[in-house]
Amino acid sequence: MSEKVEKEIGEQITKLDLSEYRSIELSKLSKENIGQKIRTFGWVANVRSQSTITFIELYAHYRTVKCVYQKKMHLTMCTSMTVYGTVSKNFGKKDAHEFEIQVEGVEIYNGAIAPSFPLNEDSSVNAILTNGHLGLRTKKRQLFLKARGHLLKIIRDFYFEGEYTEVTPPTMVQTQVEGGSTLFKLDYYGEDAYLTQSSQLYLETVVPASHRAYCIMPSYRAEKSRTRRHLSEYTHVEAEMADIDLDGLISSIEALVSYSMRRFYEEMKSDILSVFPEFEFHKVPRTPFKRIKYSEAIELLKSKGYKKEDNTDFELGDDIPDAAERYLVEVVGDGCPVFLTHFLVGHKPFYMRKDENDKGLTESTDLLFPGIGEILGGSMRQDTYEDLIEGFRRENINIDPYYWYLDMARFGPCKHGGYGLGFERFLMGLMRYESVDEATLYPRKVSRCQP
Protein backbone atom coordinates (compact mmCIF):
# COMPACT_ATOMS: atom_id res chain seq x y z
CA MET A 1 0.00 0.00 0.00
CA SER A 2 1.37 3.41 -0.92
CA GLU A 3 2.02 5.94 1.84
CA LYS A 4 -0.57 8.26 0.27
CA VAL A 5 -3.33 5.63 0.29
CA GLU A 6 -2.35 4.49 3.79
CA LYS A 7 -2.56 8.09 4.99
CA GLU A 8 -5.97 8.57 3.36
CA ILE A 9 -7.30 5.40 4.99
CA GLY A 10 -5.97 6.47 8.37
CA GLU A 11 -7.49 9.93 8.03
CA GLN A 12 -10.83 8.43 7.04
CA ILE A 13 -10.92 6.28 10.19
CA THR A 14 -10.16 9.27 12.42
CA LYS A 15 -13.16 11.09 10.94
CA LEU A 16 -15.53 8.30 11.96
CA ASP A 17 -17.32 8.15 15.30
CA LEU A 18 -16.44 4.52 15.99
CA SER A 19 -18.93 4.34 18.85
CA GLU A 20 -21.71 4.39 16.22
CA TYR A 21 -20.60 1.04 14.82
CA ARG A 22 -21.91 -2.11 16.47
CA SER A 23 -19.38 -4.94 16.61
CA ILE A 24 -20.76 -8.13 15.00
CA GLU A 25 -18.93 -11.31 14.04
CA LEU A 26 -18.84 -11.62 10.26
CA SER A 27 -20.45 -15.08 10.33
CA LYS A 28 -23.44 -13.69 12.24
CA LEU A 29 -24.23 -10.89 9.78
CA SER A 30 -27.47 -11.25 7.81
CA LYS A 31 -29.96 -9.22 5.81
CA GLU A 32 -31.64 -8.49 9.16
CA ASN A 33 -28.74 -6.07 9.74
CA ILE A 34 -29.57 -3.96 6.67
CA GLY A 35 -29.47 -0.29 7.62
CA GLN A 36 -27.20 -0.84 10.62
CA LYS A 37 -23.72 0.57 11.09
CA ILE A 38 -21.44 -2.33 11.96
CA ARG A 39 -17.82 -3.20 12.66
CA THR A 40 -16.57 -6.64 11.62
CA PHE A 41 -13.23 -8.43 11.23
CA GLY A 42 -12.05 -10.90 8.61
CA TRP A 43 -9.52 -11.91 5.98
CA VAL A 44 -9.55 -10.93 2.32
CA ALA A 45 -10.70 -13.92 0.26
CA ASN A 46 -10.87 -12.04 -3.03
CA VAL A 47 -10.48 -8.45 -4.19
CA ARG A 48 -11.22 -6.51 -7.37
CA SER A 49 -10.45 -2.82 -7.91
CA GLN A 50 -11.77 -0.38 -10.48
CA SER A 51 -10.79 3.25 -10.98
CA THR A 52 -12.56 4.62 -7.90
CA ILE A 53 -14.02 1.57 -6.17
CA THR A 54 -12.83 -1.66 -4.54
CA PHE A 55 -14.90 -4.84 -4.18
CA ILE A 56 -13.74 -7.05 -1.33
CA GLU A 57 -14.88 -10.52 -0.33
CA LEU A 58 -14.18 -10.70 3.39
CA TYR A 59 -13.99 -14.13 5.01
CA ALA A 60 -14.27 -15.48 8.56
CA HIS A 61 -15.68 -18.62 10.19
CA TYR A 62 -16.70 -20.35 6.93
CA ARG A 63 -18.59 -17.26 5.72
CA THR A 64 -17.84 -14.72 2.99
CA VAL A 65 -19.39 -11.23 2.91
CA LYS A 66 -19.26 -8.73 0.05
CA CYS A 67 -17.82 -5.31 0.93
CA VAL A 68 -17.88 -2.25 -1.36
CA TYR A 69 -15.37 0.54 -0.69
CA GLN A 70 -15.64 3.80 -2.62
CA LYS A 71 -11.88 4.08 -2.94
CA LYS A 72 -9.29 2.24 -4.98
CA MET A 73 -7.15 0.06 -2.70
CA HIS A 74 -4.35 -2.40 -3.29
CA LEU A 75 -5.15 -5.47 -1.22
CA THR A 76 -3.95 -9.07 -1.34
CA MET A 77 -5.55 -12.36 -0.40
CA CYS A 78 -5.32 -13.17 3.33
CA THR A 79 -4.78 -9.57 4.42
CA SER A 80 -6.52 -9.28 7.80
CA MET A 81 -8.64 -6.21 8.34
CA THR A 82 -11.48 -4.60 10.27
CA VAL A 83 -14.27 -3.01 8.26
CA TYR A 84 -16.55 -0.19 9.40
CA GLY A 85 -19.64 0.37 7.31
CA THR A 86 -23.37 0.16 6.77
CA VAL A 87 -25.11 -3.07 5.82
CA SER A 88 -27.20 -2.53 2.70
CA LYS A 89 -29.10 -4.38 0.04
CA ASN A 90 -26.82 -6.06 -2.49
CA PHE A 91 -26.89 -3.88 -5.60
CA GLY A 92 -24.77 -6.28 -7.64
CA LYS A 93 -26.45 -8.32 -10.35
CA LYS A 94 -23.78 -10.97 -10.87
CA ASP A 95 -23.42 -12.52 -7.42
CA ALA A 96 -25.65 -14.32 -4.94
CA HIS A 97 -24.89 -12.29 -1.81
CA GLU A 98 -28.04 -11.42 0.15
CA PHE A 99 -26.54 -8.13 1.30
CA GLU A 100 -23.34 -6.12 1.18
CA ILE A 101 -21.40 -3.74 3.39
CA GLN A 102 -20.96 -0.19 2.15
CA VAL A 103 -17.54 0.44 3.65
CA GLU A 104 -16.88 3.77 5.36
CA GLY A 105 -13.49 2.93 6.83
CA VAL A 106 -10.99 0.09 7.16
CA GLU A 107 -8.17 -0.84 9.51
CA ILE A 108 -5.46 -3.12 8.14
CA TYR A 109 -4.24 -5.27 11.03
CA ASN A 110 -0.78 -4.01 12.06
CA GLY A 111 -0.88 -1.87 8.90
CA ALA A 112 0.60 -4.76 6.90
CA ILE A 113 -0.70 -6.04 3.57
CA ALA A 114 -0.15 -9.81 3.21
CA PRO A 115 2.48 -10.95 0.67
CA SER A 116 1.34 -12.41 -2.64
CA PHE A 117 -0.48 -15.66 -1.80
CA PRO A 118 1.40 -18.73 -3.14
CA LEU A 119 -1.65 -20.96 -3.71
CA ASN A 120 -4.88 -20.93 -5.66
CA GLU A 121 -7.82 -23.27 -6.21
CA ASP A 122 -5.93 -25.01 -9.03
CA SER A 123 -2.84 -25.77 -6.93
CA SER A 124 -1.96 -29.46 -6.65
CA VAL A 125 -2.75 -31.43 -3.49
CA ASN A 126 0.98 -31.80 -2.88
CA ALA A 127 1.52 -28.02 -3.12
CA ILE A 128 -1.37 -27.35 -0.77
CA LEU A 129 -0.10 -29.89 1.79
CA THR A 130 3.49 -28.66 1.56
CA ASN A 131 2.08 -25.24 2.41
CA GLY A 132 -0.51 -26.76 4.72
CA HIS A 133 -0.61 -23.78 7.06
CA LEU A 134 -1.64 -21.58 4.12
CA GLY A 135 -3.60 -24.24 2.26
CA LEU A 136 -6.25 -23.96 4.97
CA ARG A 137 -7.12 -20.54 3.51
CA THR A 138 -8.39 -22.16 0.27
CA LYS A 139 -12.06 -23.06 -0.16
CA LYS A 140 -11.37 -26.78 -0.55
CA ARG A 141 -9.37 -27.01 2.66
CA GLN A 142 -11.87 -24.85 4.53
CA LEU A 143 -14.56 -27.30 3.44
CA PHE A 144 -12.35 -30.15 4.65
CA LEU A 145 -12.00 -28.50 8.08
CA LYS A 146 -15.74 -28.07 8.45
CA ALA A 147 -16.47 -31.58 7.15
CA ARG A 148 -13.93 -33.17 9.49
CA GLY A 149 -15.25 -31.38 12.56
CA HIS A 150 -18.83 -32.13 11.59
CA LEU A 151 -18.22 -35.84 11.07
CA LEU A 152 -16.46 -36.12 14.43
CA LYS A 153 -19.47 -34.53 16.13
CA ILE A 154 -21.88 -36.86 14.33
CA ILE A 155 -19.91 -39.93 15.42
CA ARG A 156 -19.81 -38.70 19.02
CA ASP A 157 -23.57 -38.04 18.87
CA PHE A 158 -24.11 -41.65 17.76
CA TYR A 159 -22.16 -42.98 20.71
CA PHE A 160 -23.78 -40.57 23.18
CA GLU A 161 -27.25 -41.60 22.04
CA GLY A 162 -26.21 -45.26 22.36
CA GLU A 163 -24.95 -44.72 25.94
CA TYR A 164 -21.31 -45.46 25.19
CA THR A 165 -18.71 -44.05 27.59
CA GLU A 166 -15.90 -42.04 25.97
CA VAL A 167 -12.43 -42.64 27.40
CA THR A 168 -8.90 -41.49 26.53
CA PRO A 169 -6.48 -44.44 26.77
CA PRO A 170 -2.70 -43.86 26.85
CA THR A 171 -0.80 -43.47 23.60
CA MET A 172 2.59 -44.45 25.09
CA VAL A 173 2.52 -48.19 25.73
CA GLN A 174 4.67 -51.28 26.24
CA THR A 175 2.38 -53.67 24.38
CA GLN A 176 1.53 -54.35 20.75
CA VAL A 177 -1.74 -55.07 19.00
CA GLU A 178 -1.00 -55.43 15.27
CA GLY A 179 2.53 -56.83 15.07
CA GLY A 180 5.87 -55.56 16.32
CA SER A 181 7.26 -54.57 12.92
CA THR A 182 4.95 -51.55 12.70
CA LEU A 183 5.77 -50.05 16.11
CA PHE A 184 7.34 -46.62 16.62
CA LYS A 185 9.84 -47.15 19.43
CA LEU A 186 10.75 -44.52 22.01
CA ASP A 187 12.86 -44.18 25.16
CA TYR A 188 10.54 -44.01 28.16
CA TYR A 189 12.79 -42.97 31.06
CA GLY A 190 15.31 -45.64 30.17
CA GLU A 191 12.78 -48.32 29.20
CA ASP A 192 11.50 -49.31 25.77
CA ALA A 193 8.03 -48.05 24.96
CA TYR A 194 6.02 -47.51 21.80
CA LEU A 195 3.46 -45.20 20.26
CA THR A 196 0.18 -47.08 20.34
CA GLN A 197 -1.09 -48.99 17.30
CA SER A 198 -4.56 -49.17 18.80
CA SER A 199 -6.37 -48.37 22.05
CA GLN A 200 -8.33 -51.62 21.85
CA LEU A 201 -6.76 -53.52 24.76
CA TYR A 202 -7.33 -50.60 27.13
CA LEU A 203 -10.88 -50.14 25.86
CA GLU A 204 -11.58 -53.79 26.69
CA THR A 205 -10.71 -53.11 30.34
CA VAL A 206 -13.45 -50.46 30.49
CA VAL A 207 -16.24 -52.72 29.24
CA PRO A 208 -16.93 -54.55 32.56
CA ALA A 209 -17.57 -51.15 34.14
CA SER A 210 -19.36 -49.30 31.33
CA HIS A 211 -20.75 -52.12 29.14
CA ARG A 212 -20.05 -50.00 26.04
CA ALA A 213 -17.03 -47.76 25.55
CA TYR A 214 -15.37 -45.83 22.74
CA CYS A 215 -12.46 -43.52 22.06
CA ILE A 216 -11.33 -41.22 19.26
CA MET A 217 -7.56 -41.13 19.56
CA PRO A 218 -4.43 -41.04 17.39
CA SER A 219 -2.88 -44.38 16.45
CA TYR A 220 0.51 -44.96 14.85
CA ARG A 221 1.75 -47.52 12.34
CA ALA A 222 5.36 -47.60 11.14
CA GLU A 223 4.30 -49.04 7.78
CA LYS A 224 6.37 -47.95 4.81
CA SER A 225 3.34 -48.14 2.57
CA ARG A 226 3.19 -45.53 -0.18
CA THR A 227 -0.47 -45.82 -1.10
CA ARG A 228 -3.28 -43.32 -1.35
CA ARG A 229 -4.94 -44.69 1.81
CA HIS A 230 -2.06 -45.20 4.29
CA LEU A 231 -0.92 -42.85 7.05
CA SER A 232 1.67 -43.31 9.80
CA GLU A 233 -0.49 -41.32 12.23
CA TYR A 234 -4.25 -41.37 11.96
CA THR A 235 -7.42 -40.75 13.95
CA HIS A 236 -8.77 -44.05 15.23
CA VAL A 237 -12.44 -44.42 16.17
CA GLU A 238 -12.62 -47.52 18.37
CA ALA A 239 -15.45 -49.13 20.31
CA GLU A 240 -15.89 -52.20 22.51
CA MET A 241 -19.15 -53.79 23.70
CA ALA A 242 -20.05 -56.45 26.27
CA ASP A 243 -22.58 -59.28 25.93
CA ILE A 244 -22.62 -59.30 22.13
CA ASP A 245 -22.08 -61.82 19.32
CA LEU A 246 -20.65 -61.37 15.81
CA ASP A 247 -24.03 -60.59 14.27
CA GLY A 248 -24.68 -57.99 16.95
CA LEU A 249 -21.23 -56.50 16.43
CA ILE A 250 -21.78 -56.18 12.68
CA SER A 251 -25.23 -54.66 13.26
CA SER A 252 -23.71 -52.03 15.55
CA ILE A 253 -21.18 -51.13 12.84
CA GLU A 254 -23.96 -50.86 10.26
CA ALA A 255 -25.85 -48.53 12.58
CA LEU A 256 -22.80 -46.27 13.04
CA VAL A 257 -22.01 -46.06 9.32
CA SER A 258 -25.60 -45.53 8.16
CA TYR A 259 -26.28 -42.92 10.85
CA SER A 260 -23.06 -41.06 10.07
CA MET A 261 -23.52 -41.10 6.29
CA ARG A 262 -27.14 -39.96 6.45
CA ARG A 263 -26.54 -37.08 8.84
CA PHE A 264 -23.26 -36.02 7.21
CA TYR A 265 -24.79 -35.70 3.74
CA GLU A 266 -27.97 -34.06 5.03
CA GLU A 267 -26.13 -31.46 7.09
CA MET A 268 -23.13 -30.84 4.82
CA LYS A 269 -24.88 -31.00 1.45
CA SER A 270 -25.07 -27.26 0.75
CA ASP A 271 -21.47 -26.70 1.89
CA ILE A 272 -20.20 -29.49 -0.35
CA LEU A 273 -22.15 -28.30 -3.39
CA SER A 274 -20.94 -24.72 -2.90
CA VAL A 275 -17.38 -25.94 -3.55
CA PHE A 276 -18.07 -29.01 -5.73
CA PRO A 277 -21.27 -28.25 -7.71
CA GLU A 278 -21.11 -31.59 -9.55
CA PHE A 279 -20.44 -33.70 -6.44
CA GLU A 280 -21.91 -37.23 -6.55
CA PHE A 281 -23.15 -38.27 -3.13
CA HIS A 282 -22.87 -41.93 -2.16
CA LYS A 283 -26.09 -43.82 -1.63
CA VAL A 284 -26.80 -44.16 2.09
CA PRO A 285 -26.93 -47.96 2.35
CA ARG A 286 -29.90 -49.84 3.69
CA THR A 287 -29.27 -52.31 6.48
CA PRO A 288 -28.26 -55.07 6.62
CA PHE A 289 -25.21 -54.55 4.42
CA LYS A 290 -24.11 -57.38 2.16
CA ARG A 291 -21.70 -59.87 3.78
CA ILE A 292 -19.25 -62.32 2.27
CA LYS A 293 -16.83 -64.68 4.01
CA TYR A 294 -13.13 -64.41 3.22
CA SER A 295 -13.08 -67.91 1.67
CA GLU A 296 -16.11 -67.06 -0.48
CA ALA A 297 -14.44 -63.85 -1.61
CA ILE A 298 -11.36 -65.79 -2.73
CA GLU A 299 -13.54 -68.17 -4.73
CA LEU A 300 -15.51 -65.26 -6.23
CA LEU A 301 -12.33 -63.52 -7.38
CA LYS A 302 -11.14 -66.76 -8.98
CA SER A 303 -14.47 -67.41 -10.68
CA LYS A 304 -14.54 -63.87 -12.08
CA GLY A 305 -11.00 -64.20 -13.41
CA TYR A 306 -9.75 -61.38 -11.16
CA LYS A 307 -5.98 -61.88 -10.91
CA LYS A 308 -3.30 -60.88 -8.44
CA GLU A 309 -0.62 -58.39 -9.47
CA ASP A 310 1.60 -61.25 -10.69
CA ASN A 311 -1.29 -62.43 -12.91
CA THR A 312 -1.91 -65.60 -10.88
CA ASP A 313 -5.16 -66.69 -9.23
CA PHE A 314 -6.02 -65.80 -5.67
CA GLU A 315 -5.68 -68.71 -3.26
CA LEU A 316 -6.85 -69.32 0.29
CA GLY A 317 -4.34 -67.61 2.57
CA ASP A 318 -3.68 -64.66 0.24
CA ASP A 319 -4.25 -61.12 1.45
CA ILE A 320 -6.91 -59.33 -0.56
CA PRO A 321 -5.41 -55.99 -1.72
CA ASP A 322 -7.28 -52.70 -1.87
CA ALA A 323 -8.04 -52.88 -5.60
CA ALA A 324 -9.65 -56.30 -5.16
CA GLU A 325 -11.56 -55.00 -2.12
CA ARG A 326 -13.01 -52.20 -4.24
CA TYR A 327 -13.95 -54.78 -6.87
CA LEU A 328 -15.83 -56.78 -4.22
CA VAL A 329 -17.75 -53.65 -3.20
CA GLU A 330 -18.97 -53.23 -6.77
CA VAL A 331 -19.73 -56.91 -7.44
CA VAL A 332 -21.13 -57.94 -4.06
CA GLY A 333 -22.44 -54.66 -2.68
CA ASP A 334 -23.57 -52.95 -5.88
CA GLY A 335 -21.52 -49.91 -4.90
CA CYS A 336 -22.51 -49.99 -1.22
CA PRO A 337 -20.36 -51.04 1.78
CA VAL A 338 -19.68 -54.75 2.21
CA PHE A 339 -18.59 -56.82 5.21
CA LEU A 340 -15.76 -59.29 4.60
CA THR A 341 -15.88 -61.86 7.42
CA HIS A 342 -14.27 -64.97 8.98
CA PHE A 343 -10.57 -64.52 8.24
CA LEU A 344 -8.06 -67.30 8.84
CA VAL A 345 -6.66 -67.62 12.39
CA GLY A 346 -3.06 -67.42 11.18
CA HIS A 347 -3.71 -64.09 9.45
CA LYS A 348 -5.25 -62.27 12.42
CA PRO A 349 -3.92 -61.10 15.83
CA PHE A 350 -3.89 -63.10 19.06
CA TYR A 351 -6.93 -61.37 20.56
CA MET A 352 -9.48 -62.50 17.96
CA ARG A 353 -11.97 -65.16 19.01
CA LYS A 354 -12.07 -68.39 17.01
CA ASP A 355 -15.22 -69.45 15.21
CA GLU A 356 -16.92 -72.13 17.30
CA ASN A 357 -17.85 -74.09 14.17
CA ASP A 358 -14.41 -73.90 12.53
CA LYS A 359 -11.39 -73.34 14.78
CA GLY A 360 -9.32 -72.40 11.74
CA LEU A 361 -11.35 -69.21 11.31
CA THR A 362 -11.83 -66.09 13.41
CA GLU A 363 -15.06 -64.31 14.27
CA SER A 364 -13.83 -61.23 12.48
CA THR A 365 -14.87 -58.66 9.91
CA ASP A 366 -13.55 -55.86 7.73
CA LEU A 367 -15.84 -53.20 6.31
CA LEU A 368 -15.11 -52.39 2.66
CA PHE A 369 -16.17 -48.92 1.51
CA PRO A 370 -16.83 -47.75 -2.08
CA GLY A 371 -13.78 -46.28 -3.79
CA ILE A 372 -11.39 -47.17 -0.96
CA GLY A 373 -11.63 -50.72 0.33
CA GLU A 374 -11.13 -51.53 4.00
CA ILE A 375 -11.92 -48.68 6.40
CA LEU A 376 -12.76 -50.70 9.53
CA GLY A 377 -11.65 -53.91 11.20
CA GLY A 378 -13.45 -55.67 14.02
CA SER A 379 -13.87 -58.98 15.78
CA MET A 380 -15.16 -60.84 18.75
CA ARG A 381 -12.41 -60.93 21.38
CA GLN A 382 -10.82 -63.94 23.05
CA ASP A 383 -12.31 -64.36 26.51
CA THR A 384 -10.57 -67.45 27.91
CA TYR A 385 -7.16 -67.40 29.56
CA GLU A 386 -6.01 -70.53 27.72
CA ASP A 387 -6.91 -69.19 24.27
CA LEU A 388 -5.11 -65.92 24.97
CA ILE A 389 -1.96 -67.74 26.09
CA GLU A 390 -2.13 -69.85 22.92
CA GLY A 391 -2.43 -66.68 20.83
CA PHE A 392 0.58 -65.07 22.51
CA ARG A 393 2.66 -68.19 21.91
CA ARG A 394 1.53 -68.44 18.29
CA GLU A 395 2.80 -64.91 17.66
CA ASN A 396 5.88 -65.31 19.87
CA ILE A 397 4.84 -62.45 22.16
CA ASN A 398 6.24 -62.12 25.70
CA ILE A 399 3.19 -62.23 28.00
CA ASP A 400 4.76 -60.32 30.92
CA PRO A 401 3.71 -56.80 29.77
CA TYR A 402 0.16 -58.13 29.25
CA TYR A 403 -0.48 -59.27 32.83
CA TRP A 404 -3.29 -56.75 33.16
CA TYR A 405 -4.91 -57.84 29.90
CA LEU A 406 -4.78 -61.51 30.91
CA ASP A 407 -6.52 -60.60 34.16
CA MET A 408 -9.57 -59.68 32.08
CA ALA A 409 -10.00 -63.40 31.31
CA ARG A 410 -9.76 -64.30 35.01
CA PHE A 411 -11.91 -61.68 36.71
CA GLY A 412 -15.43 -62.02 35.34
CA PRO A 413 -14.89 -62.48 31.58
CA CYS A 414 -17.77 -62.07 29.14
CA LYS A 415 -18.46 -62.45 25.47
CA HIS A 416 -17.42 -59.14 23.95
CA GLY A 417 -16.31 -57.56 20.70
CA GLY A 418 -15.27 -54.33 19.09
CA TYR A 419 -13.81 -52.53 16.10
CA GLY A 420 -11.53 -49.78 14.91
CA LEU A 421 -12.53 -47.32 12.18
CA GLY A 422 -9.95 -45.28 10.28
CA PHE A 423 -11.57 -41.85 10.55
CA GLU A 424 -9.58 -40.27 7.71
CA ARG A 425 -10.43 -43.17 5.39
CA PHE A 426 -14.11 -42.78 6.23
CA LEU A 427 -13.97 -39.03 5.52
CA MET A 428 -11.98 -39.72 2.35
CA GLY A 429 -14.78 -42.02 1.18
CA LEU A 430 -17.62 -39.66 2.05
CA MET A 431 -15.92 -36.70 0.35
CA ARG A 432 -14.61 -38.77 -2.59
CA TYR A 433 -11.06 -37.56 -2.01
CA GLU A 434 -8.41 -39.11 -4.24
CA SER A 435 -6.00 -39.52 -1.33
CA VAL A 436 -6.29 -39.90 2.43
CA ASP A 437 -3.90 -36.92 2.61
CA GLU A 438 -6.82 -34.68 1.62
CA ALA A 439 -8.80 -35.99 4.61
CA THR A 440 -5.99 -35.15 7.05
CA LEU A 441 -5.02 -31.84 8.64
CA TYR A 442 -1.25 -32.40 8.50
CA PRO A 443 -0.50 -35.87 7.04
CA ARG A 444 2.25 -37.99 8.58
CA LYS A 445 3.53 -40.77 6.35
CA VAL A 446 6.73 -42.23 4.93
CA SER A 447 7.41 -39.19 2.78
CA ARG A 448 6.06 -36.40 4.98
CA CYS A 449 6.62 -35.11 8.51
CA GLN A 450 6.24 -31.37 7.80
CA PRO A 451 4.81 -28.87 8.31
Curated annotation (Swiss-Prot):
> One Pfam family of this protein, by short name?
tRNA-synt_2
Question: What is the catalytic activity of this protein?
Answer: tRNA(Asn) + L-asparagine + ATP = L-asparaginyl-tRNA(Asn) + AMP + diphosphate + H(+)
Whether Transmembrane counts among this entry's keywords is no
Q: What GO terms fall under cellular component here?
A: cytoplasm
Indicate the principal place this protein occupies in or around the cell: cytoplasm
Molecular function GO terms recorded? asparagine-tRNA ligase activity; ATP binding
Output the InterPro entries linked to this UniProt entry. Answer: Aa-tRNA-synt_II, aa-tRNA-synth_II, aa-tRNA-synth_II/BPL/LPL, Asn-tRNA-ligase, Asp/Asn-tRNA-synth_IIb, NA-bd_OB-fold
Per UniProt, the keywords (alphabetical) are: Aminoacyl-tRNA synthetase, ATP-binding, Cytoplasm, Ligase, Nucleotide-binding, Protein biosynthesis
Record-level GO BP terms: asparaginyl-tRNA aminoacylation
Question: What are the annotated disulfide bridges?
Answer: none
The record's Gene3D superfamilies line, in alphabetical order, gives: Bira Bifunctional Protein, Domain 2 (3.30.930.10), Nucleic acid-binding proteins (2.40.50.140)
Family in the record: Belongs to the class-II aminoacyl-tRNA synthetase family.
The family database entries (NCBIfam families) matched by this protein are listed as: asnS
This protein is called what? Answer: Probable asparagine--tRNA ligase, cytoplasmic
From which source organism is this entry? Encephalitozoon cuniculi (strain GB-M1)
